[in-house]
Amino acid sequence: MQIVEKSGEGLSRVFGVTVPASELATRLEARIAEVAPQMNVKGFRPGKVPTAHVRRLYGKALMGEVIEQALNETTTKVLEDNKLRPAGQPELNPSSDMDKVIAGGEDLSFDLAVEVMPEFEPIDPTSIELVKPVYKVSDEEVQEALDELAKQARTYEPRTGKSLKAKDGDQLLIDFVGTIDGVEFAGGKAEGAELVLGSGQFIPGFEDQLVGAKPGDDVVVKVKFPEEYQAKDLAGKDAEFATKVQEVRAPVDGKADDELAKRLGLSDLAALTELLKSNLAGRYDNSSRFKLKRALLDVLDTKHDFPLPPRMVDAEFAGIWQQVEADKARGGLPPEDAEKTEDQLKDEYKKIAERRVRLGLVLAEIGRKNDVVVTDQELTDAIMREARQYGAQAQQVFDMYRQRADLQAALRAPIYEDKVVDLIFGKAKIEEKEVSKDELLEEDDLPEGYGG
């Protein structure tokens, strides 16, 4: 086997490799000798098939295996002998006539092209200074959350007294039959339907015409189905609903008390209050961490300047641009992007791709230097969380993830990133700064994905 470095510019390396036909022939004979005893061929006793017969029947297939093994071994040897850390899968470009190589009449020659990881010294996490925005949950917010829960737990009771007329916010018990040009249509009939006036539950205009109705009233509701109505045969058509009002019920707000807490599975109001406070604090903690991480990534981005592997950037950009094209096709581009030319968008998103790759390499190097790893248990837990989202298919999804390295890698990456980020947070100098809720929750101006 002969290996020669043909070029080495920037992060790109190209090696010329030649595996003599004689070496491939020797490997083929060894492979035939290995499989012959295991073969059952008609006309021969098990394990007694002559190697010449095996070569005649399966020589091409076995030579294919030999060549594939030679390519893999050569790639490993080139990387190890030259102490290269590949930034991606090396490219193999054969220069031989592969039919002749398989037939044993030509050496296997190919170029092995590889992009290597850039060499750089990452920033010392202990030198990083960050400001963490924090916001403490107020008693007023907790009370608002309690009041909202009580509101959601409202009940409805039949109206009594002098006025039984339905008001906005009341719940009506109704029967109705819908017709178009005097003919009933599918799905337009119901008995004992509960409808809260003003909820927007029915098509526009329906609920408004029932305001003021009393129990026992017959109301002909005239409406027009929206042009974009999901049932295409009804879209844009005029309809009438013969509606019988059975009951008019007034809303009765629930109370934030021990009874409400027990209905929600808690011991008392104090436990419910503490749970709501904890949930709110968790939400604000997540926002605080997000902004702190964004600030950290900004520091890492500005403090590092090194050449990026072009193919890594191209692959990252391709993924981003595919999403941009999909957003554009469904009219989902942000207004500021919709005004830009394709060249302007590509330039912006190319910078985003470069930032992502740079940050990924920096975090990976900091993690490598600090022996950060994703444990098998952490990966298994992530797979289980993913699988549980698929309900009855959870086991099939779990098994699929277990069998596919690419899916595991997609789950492992964010876990690894968060572990490295947490490591940096543990070493950096972080000053907490109290901010308002609006300041904490306001979105950053950076384009989506700029955070890495």
UniProtKB/Swiss-Prot annotation:
Q: Choose one Gene Ontology CC annotation of this protein and give it.
A: cytoplasm
Which EC class does it fall in? isomerase
Output the Pfam families linked to this UniProt entry: FKBP_C, Trigger_C, Trigger_N
What residue stretches are annotated with the PPIase FKBP-type domain? Answer: 169-254
Give the signal sequence positions.
none
This enzyme catalyses: [protein]-peptidylproline (omega=180) = [protein]-peptidylproline (omega=0)
Coarsely, its chief localization is cytoplasm
UniProt EC number? 5.2.1.8
Transmembrane segment boundaries: none
InterPro entries annotated for this entry? Answer: PPIase_dom_sf, PPIase_FKBP_dom, Trig_fac, Trigger_fac_C, Trigger_fac_C_sf, Trigger_fac_ribosome-bd_bac, Trigger_fac_ribosome-bd_sf, Trigger_fact/SurA_dom_sf
Among Gene3D superfamilies, the record links this protein to:
3.10.50.40, Trigger factor ribosome-binding domain, Trigger factor, C-terminal domain
What function does this protein fulfil?
A: Involved in protein export. Acts as a chaperone by maintaining the newly synthesized protein in an open conformation. Functions as a peptidyl-prolyl cis-trans isomerase.
Domain free text = Consists of 3 domains; the N-terminus binds the ribosome, the middle domain has PPIase activity, while the C-terminus has intrinsic chaperone activity on its own.
Q: Which PANTHER family match?
A: TRIGGER FACTOR CHAPERONE AND PEPTIDYL-PROLYL CIS/TRANS ISOMERASE (PTHR30560), TRIGGER FACTOR-LIKE PROTEIN TIG, CHLOROPLASTIC (PTHR30560:SF3)
Q: What is this protein called?
A: Trigger factor
The species this protein was found in: Caulobacter vibrioides (strain NA1000 / CB15N) (Caulobacter crescentus)
Write the lineage as a comma-separated list: Bacteria, Pseudomonadati, Pseudomonadota, Alphaproteobacteria, Caulobacterales
| Gene this chain is encoded by | tig
